[in-house]
Curated annotation (Swiss-Prot):
Disulfide bonds: none annotated. It is found in: Plastid, Cyanelle thylakoid membrane. The gene is psaD. Belongs to the PsaD family. PsaD can form complexes with ferredoxin and ferredoxin-oxidoreductase in photosystem I (PS I) reaction center. PSAD may encode the ferredoxin-docking protein. It comes from Cyanophora paradoxa. Residues 209-220 have a biased composition (Basic and acidic residues). It is a peripheral membrane protein. This is Photosystem I reaction center subunit II, cyanelle. Residues 1-53 form a transit peptide. InterPro entries: PsaD, PsaD_sf. Residues 192-220 are annotated as: Disordered. Keywords: Cyanelle, Membrane, Photosynthesis, Photosystem I, Plastid, Thylakoid, Transit peptide.
Length: 220
């Protein structure tokens, strides 16, 4: 029995030695050969110094007050009775009989191109490229046509005149050169009353006086 153990022991030792050498060989194959570590050195970059000359502070500029340009004084335009009329094959309905006794109305505008537009009296016409003149019986017809020119064709230079039988011409719209819906400095309000409706006087106090509550200067 002892002889058997003695004979086996060297085999086991030899086997362990061969196993350890094989494992080391595998480790070397897996991890690679040993590499000697090198010392890392850090070199600081040379410092840069930028020299800048101090700029002299500019003296504060004097504030120049911008004055609003004074509006140009409005001059009443003159009516050119020889301006061409729009092209249409029908009639505007003619002028009323009062045109021979009282007045008729004219509207002028500058067309951008020959474009078809609707007449306030019915039907359609072709406005000319350039100056146009149309005679109508009522001021309301001119205002309606002016609204169409402004909204649909973006024409804002239309003007309305009243022409009397004597040949006298009265400029009506826009009265001061600016349309009523726009603010015009210096415009005087017409028919305005700086008070609320609740501050109007009692109608009983104005009875038989020929005054209206909104026109009276009486206070509550």
């Amino acid at each position: 029995m002892n002889a058997f153990v003695a004979s086996v022991a060297p085999i086991a030792v030899a086997g362990s030695a061969t196993l350890s050498s094989a494992v080391c060989a595998q480790k070397k194959a897996f991890f690679g050969a040993q590499v000697a570590a090198k010392k890392t050195t850090f070199e600081a970059a040379p410092a840069r110094f930028i020299v800048r000359a101090e700029e002299e502070e500019a003296a504060p500029a004097e504030k120049v007050e911008k004055k609003a340009a004074a509006p140009k004084p409005f001059s009443v335009p003159t009516l050119n009775l020889n301006a061409p009329t729009p092209i249409f094959g029908g009639s505007t309905g003619g002028l009323l009989r009062k045109a021979e006794v009282e007045e008729f109305y004219s509207i002028t505008w500058t067309g951008k191109s020959e474009t078809v537009f609707e007449l306030p009296t019915g039907g359609a016409a072709i406005m000319r490229a350039g100056e146009n003149l149309l005679r109508l019986a009522r001021k309301e017809q001119c205002i309606a046509l002016g609204a169409q020119l402004k909204d649909k064709f973006k024409i804002t230079d239309y003007k309305i005149y009243r022409v009397y039988p004597s040949g006298e011409v009265q400029f009506l719209h826009p009265k001061d050169g600016v349309f009523p819906e726009k603010v015009n400095p210096g415009r005087v309000a017409v028919g305005s009353n700086k008070r609320r409706i609740g501050q109007n006087p009692d109608p009983a106090k104005l009875k038989f006086k020929g005054q209206e509550t909104f026109d009276s200067d009486l206070k509550l």
